[in-house]
UniProtKB/Swiss-Prot annotation:
Descriptive protein name: Parathyroid hormone
Matches recorded under PROSITE patterns: PARATHYROID (PS00335)
Function recorded in the entry: Parathyroid hormone elevates calcium level by dissolving the salts in bone and preventing their renal excretion. Acts by binding to its receptor, PTH1R, activating G protein-coupled receptor signaling. Stimulates [1-14C]-2-deoxy-D-glucose (2DG) transport and glycogen synthesis in osteoblastic cells.
Subunit structure: Interacts with PTH1R (via N-terminal extracellular domain).
One GO cellular component term noted in the UniProt record for this chain: extracellular space
GO function term, MF aspect, one: parathyroid hormone receptor binding
């Protein structure tokens, strides 16, 4: 068994270790480089998935527009842009009603009609 003097020495050493190790209740372990890299990759993956979902929704809107039978003007040449400003008009019969349109559609429609 330990004597009282040895027990006091052990207690003083334990107190010194606890007092000098300034953890302040915070976790002592820091993140390793691999954990930081994993979190970075996860953030990039999530933002990439958000972009893919946005693109999928936009392509679905285009597909629905074409499926409605909207007239598509075919032009000679490789340019997809209208040759004249007058050629760039909205198709009146296939516009969304204001109840169905989202804010971006309303902004585009008001700007296009004011010109």
């Amino acid at each position: 068994m330990m004597s009282a003097k040895d027990m006091v020495k052990v207690m003083i050493v334990m107190f010194a270790i606890c007092f000098l190790a300034k953890s302040d209740g915070k976790p002592v372990k820091k993140r390793s480089v691999s954990e930081i890299q994993f979190m970075h990759n996860l953030g990039k993956h999530l933002s990439s998935m958000e972009r893919v979902e946005w693109l999928r929704k936009k392509l679905q809107d285009v597909h629905n527009f074409v499926a409605l039978g909207a007239p598509i003007a075919h032009r000679d040449g490789s340019s997809q842009r209208p040759l004249k400003k007058e050629d760039n008009v909205l198709v009146e019969s296939y516009q969304k009603s204001l109840g169905e349109a989202d804010k971006a559609d309303v902004d585009v429609l008001t700007k296009a009609k004011s010109q």
